[in-house]
Amino acid sequence: MAFAPEHFGNPLREQALLAQGQAWAWLSRDVVEVSGADWLSYLTTVSTQVLTDLENDGQSRQVLFLDANGHILYAALAVAALVPDSGEQSVLLLVDAGCGEGLAQLLNSRRFMLRVQAQVRPDLQVAGAIGDAVQKLAGVVENLVTTWSDPWPGITPGGSTYFTGTRHPGANYRA
């Protein structure tokens, strides 16, 4: 879904409901599905994150895709998912609207002889929620494929910590 409304008439009230975990919102994100027998090792090789253990539905990471000079090309939220129409385990990369096609082309151009395919999934939409609204979202949205959970401030495999403070305000965020 490339378009998400900015608000529904009362942005301050809507923000308060979101912050309280009483509402959810459609997010303006493109979804790129990466599938095939080699996707785990392939994405670990071409990204900044270790994804070889991302085998179970719902496991998630934040990942960057860099150019040859180390500049960020794409930032994505990666979540393992069993996509209903294909029936196979894959990873969904959630990127900013308008970036999906470019990321899919980049991933397909770097696959060489590996059994992996990246494709934009315009039929999949992204919604965001905090706290109790995650359960409400699951009850409202038909054909919910998976949820992405922000692992921060925890340490993911292959990651490191840079935060020693109190609980992060986005700890209950799901997309």
Regions found by a protein language model. Name each.
Residues M1-A175:
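Basic, glycine/lysine-rich polyanion-binding surfaces/domains
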